[in-house]
């Protein structure tokens, strides 16, 4: 009876370890999906390391990324933001090798929104790999996004 109990306990431990390894594997697959053209939701800490550390560089714009990006300041309750969201998701996939698309929920990241003076949403930052960003307010059409991406972010005519 004791051996049967020990065997059962070992089986339970092995099952837990294998489930834990599976969960870690799923996380890394999700991380790869983000790198392959998904829209990435940022918090303040992520923004400071991936986009612009305004606490360290208060007088000069220094982009922290290596690919051009779009940053969408949005809210879940915002109608125009809901129109822009699927367009950005589609563009993140279409331009997955060229740009990164980020989203920042202004209700969750009030300090970050205040740092950029966000007063209306959606507000979009178009950030080239080198140079200063451009800002756009309001819902843009897919054609307007494509124009901004190609001409401003990627420098195509």
Which residues does each predicted region cover?
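N-terminal targeting signals for export/organelle localization
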Residues: 1-48, 156-157
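A short beta-strand-turn-helix
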Residues: 43-68
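Short pre-active-site segment immediately N-terminal to redox-active cysteine/selenocysteine motifs
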Residues: 66-69, 73-77, 120
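Loop/turn elements at helix/coil->beta-strand transitions in domains of secreted/extracellular proteins
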Residues: 66-69, 97-99, 129
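Structural micro-motif
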Residues: 68, 110, 116-125
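Thiol-based oxidoreductase modules, predominantly thioredoxin-like and allied folds used
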Residues: 73, 84-92, 96-111, 118
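C-type cytochrome heme c attachment motif
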Residues: 76-83, 123
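Non-catalytic, surface beta->alpha helical segment in thiol-disulfide oxidoreductase systems
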Residues: 120, 125-157
């Amino acid at each position: 009876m004791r051996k049967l109990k020990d065997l059962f306990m070992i089986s339970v431990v092995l099952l837990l370890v294998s489930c834990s390894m599976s969960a870690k594997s799923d996380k890394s697959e999700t991380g790869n999906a983000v790198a392959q053209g998904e829209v990435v939701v940022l918090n303040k800490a992520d923004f400071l390391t991936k986009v612009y550390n305004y606490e360290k560089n208060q007088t000069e714009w220094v982009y922290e990324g290596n690919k051009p990006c779009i940053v969408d300041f949005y809210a879940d309750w915002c109608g125009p933001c809901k129109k822009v969201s699927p367009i950005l998701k589609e563009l993140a996939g279409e331009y997955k090798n060229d740009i990164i698309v980020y989203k920042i929920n202004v209700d969750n990241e009030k300090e970050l929104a205040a740092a950029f003076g966000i007063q209306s949403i959606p507000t979009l930052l178009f950030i080239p790999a080198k140079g200063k960003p451009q800002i756009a307010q309001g819902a843009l059409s897919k054609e307007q996004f494509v124009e901004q991406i190609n001409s401003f972010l990627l420098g195509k005519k």
